[in-house]
A protein has these predicted regions:
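Intrinsically disordered, low-complexity, charge-dense segments enriched in Lys/Arg
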Residues: 80-156
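Intrinsically disordered, low-complexity regulatory segments enriched in Ser/Thr/Pro
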Residues: 43-79
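Residues that form generic nucleotide/phosphate-binding pockets
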Residues: 10, 14, 70, 114
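A generic structural signal for ordered alpha-helices
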Residues: 15, 45-49, 89, 93
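N-terminal "first-domain core" detector
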Residues: 1-41
Length: 156
C-alpha cells in the first residue's frame, strides 16, 4: 500500500472512531470542490480543494503532525458550518458587533468542540484564528475564546 493511501485510511479510521463526517478524498475527487489529500516524496503532504480539474488552495508540508492538524481542522470546520446552517434563524437581526447574532460564532464553537475530541492540544491554535476572524469586522475587537466554557465571549 502506498504512503498516501495508508495515511488516508489512518485518518478515516480515526474519524470513524470519533463519529466525525469524513468528506476527504484520496487524490483528486470528482471535481465539484471536494477536499482532497495526497502525498509525494517531492512535495510531502498535500491538502487541497479539487474543482473543475484544478487543485485550489493547496496546502503543502513535510510535517505530518501539522498536516494531520490541517486535515482534522477542515473536517471539523465542515461539520461546524453544517451545524451553523441547521441553527440559522432567518428572522434574527445579524450584526457583526453583536456576538450572539453572529452565526459564525456557532460554527466556530462547534468546530472547536469537535477538534477537541481529536486532539485537545490543537484548541489554542484554532481558537486564535477564529477569534481574529470574529474580531475582524467588529468595532471593538473584544471577542475572546473561553476555553473552560468552550465558547466565544465578549470582554466588557
Amino acid at each position: 500500500m502506498d504512503k498516501a493511501k495508508q495515511i488516508y485510511l489512518e485518518f478515516k479510521r480515526e474519524a470513524d472512531f470519533l463519529e466525525l463526517d469524513f468528506p476527504l478524498f484520496l487524490g483528486d475527487g470528482p471535481g465539484f470542490g471536494e477536499l482532497c489529500m495526497d502525498y509525494s516524496e517531492q512535495d510531502g503532504y498535500m491538502l487541497y480543494g479539487y474543482e473543475r480539474g484544478k487543485r485550489n488552495s493547496e496546502f503543502k508540508t513535510t510535517d505530518f503532525e501539522e498536516f494531520k492538524y490541517e486535515v482534522f481542522l477542515h473536517i471539523c470546520w465542515y461539520m461546524g458550518m453544517e451545524f451553523e446552517l441547521r441553527h440559522w434563524k432567518e428572522d434574527m437581526r445579524h450584526d457583526d458587533n453583536i456576538l450572539e447574532t453572529d452565526t459564525r460564532k456557532i460554527a466556530f464553537e462547534k468546530t472547536l468542540q469537535l477538534l477537541k475530541m481529536v486532539n485537545p492540544a490543537w484548541i489554542d491554535k484554532a481558537a486564535q484564528g477564529y477569534t481574529a476572524y470574529l474580531n475582524l469586522w467588529r468595532e471593538n475587537k473584544n471577542v475572546y475564546f473561553d476555553k473552560e466554557a468552550m465558547e466565544f465571549k465578549v470582554n466588557s
